[in-house]
């Protein structure tokens, strides 16, 4: 894979984590939230398989 960013991105807030709801997704029902390494100020949450968290 590509090298990880070498700077500390801010963590997603608890509210953003709570707002991510993947329960409607039968397979990818686990939330993974992270800041975009490209420098986006928005917290990006997406649904992943539980074992990929």
Curated annotation (Swiss-Prot):
The cysteine framework is XXII (C-C-C-C-C-C-C-C). Keywords: Disulfide bond, Ion channel impairing toxin, Neurotoxin, Secreted, Toxin. Residues 1-5 form a propeptide. Contains 4 disulfide bonds. The keyword Disulfide bond applies. GO terms for molecular function: ion channel regulator activity; toxin activity. Probable neurotoxin with unknown target. Possibly targets ion channels. It is found in: Secreted. This is Conotoxin Cal22e. The keyword Transit peptide does not apply. It comes from Californiconus californicus. Coiled coil: none annotated. GO terms for cellular component: extracellular region. Expressed by the venom duct.
């Amino acid at each position: 894979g590509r090298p990880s960013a070498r700077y500390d991105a801010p963590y997603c807030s608890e509210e953003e984590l709570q707002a991510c709801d993947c329960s409607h997704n039968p397979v990818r029902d686990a939330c993974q939230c992270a800041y975009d390494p490209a420098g986006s100020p928005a917290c990006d949450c997406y649904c992943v398989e539980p074992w990929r968290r």
